[in-house]
Amino acid sequence: LLAIKGVGSITIAGFIAEPGDIRRFDSPKQIQKYAGLEPVENSSGKHKGRMRISKCGRRKLRKILYQVMAPLLARNREFREIYDYYVTRVKNPLKRRQAMVAVSCKLIRVFWAVLTKGVDYDKFKMMSDIHREGSFIAA
């Protein structure tokens, strides 16, 4: 996990300590829910509410993921490109905070894969779902 630029030992220790044994989660989606980062809609009847994160879950885990965003986006080119993609995409661009939540969820998926499957961090595999012209990681 230290191979990911912008992620330090304190972040890793907090991420591992807060949820406990990562292997008890069947998917990274469960960790996102555990952290309270899953989207919920506030709607009633014909009223269509806006989407937001639920905030039901581990507050400290959310805080750890939020605090790692500044150094991660400053030092890690791949995560910065994912963030920029979410903010500037033509169809459904996200606001800055929404993009940070999306990148946090991506980081959870990377952490989960490294810790449960025993794979190494691979920036090309991580970027495979983002298709953007002029990307520095063109496949």
Go through each PLM region and give its residues.
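Phosphate-backbone recognition surface of nucleic-acid-processing proteins
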Residues: 2-5, 9-92, 96
